[in-house]
Amino acid sequence: MKKAFNLFDVTLRDGLQTSKKIYTLNEKKQLLHSIMNNYNPLHIEIGSLVSKKVLPQMNNSMELYNYAVEQYPKSNFYMLIPNIKYLKEGVNNGVNNFSFITSVSNEFQKKNTNMELYKTKNELNHMIRYVDKNCNNPIKKLYLSCINECPIAGKIENIRIV
């Protein structure tokens, strides 16, 4: 029987990106070992390829990804990719499992990515085509933010989601 859903550990990406502390690569490796030894998740979002100035917490994400793939070959490691520039970097460095993000709220999308929703949709389409063309059996997942309410614009009308 096929699973209806997969669980993802996002500690090393979502958990660290809001931290005031900037973790070293060795500290991130220790966190990875702790997660693997205690929980052994099959799917892990290991980091994000973003500007080091915008999110210094995600520094060394590519190095951590490569380390994780080598150390734990039975797990699936994902990288959150916000745009085509960082997608090309990820593909060129062997990333094959991708997390993408968009929003239902134009206001949230502009604040989060500096792009309007229509531009984000075009960018995502371009990114997915790029992955399909340049990777062998890539796995892609999409985060959809603000499906009920936006912290900036308030309640989201259900018709916009459909």
Residue ranges and their predicted role:
Residues 8-29, 75-84, 109-116, 146-160:
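Active-site mouth loops of central-metabolism enzymes
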